[in-house]
Regions:
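N-terminus-centric sequence/structural signature that marks the extreme N-terminus
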Residues: 1-129
Length: 129
């Protein structure tokens, strides 16, 4: 499994703490040697260490998509064995994808079904949106 970290807070502007989110992410280097990334906004910071298994170039995390009410971001660790079926279902509902990664499928699934996306996933995983 990959390594994920998160920080949600409303008492600080977390953008001012970007270096701390990057340090938190760096502590998990052993969980994913292939890539790392951070996403920091006013009230949320996510970090991810990646062991690339699928879509080596397109599956960078944290991943975000713009919505009318602001960006929605995800960090995801795991394997969803049915992500291709879910992707086809979501495409049929009008979602478009930029990568072949399971992470993007989970993110779009969250946008479509909310937290109930977890009930549709077949596999082992952890994620934060």
């Amino acid at each position: 499994m990959f390594g994920i970290v998160g920080w949600v807070g409303f008492e600080h502007d977390i953008r001012e703490k970007r270096a701390l989110v990057e340090e938190m992410t760096a502590t998990m280097r052993y969980r994913g040697p292939d890539d790392s990334g951070t996403y920091v906004d006013a009230h949320v910071g996510f970090g991810h260490r990646r062991l690339a298994l699928i879509d080596l170039s397109g599956g960078r995390q944290p991943m975000s998509v713009p919505t009318p009410s602001g960006d929605v971001a995800i960090v995801y660790s795991g394997e969803s064995y049915n992500f291709r079926e879910l992707r086809a279902e979501l495409a049929g509902l009008g979602h478009s994808f930029d990568t072949d990664s399971g992470t993007e499928v989970v993110l779009h699934g969250y946008l479509q079904w909310g937290a109930a996306v977890a009930e549709r996933l077949n596999g082992m995983y952890a994620f934060a949106v």
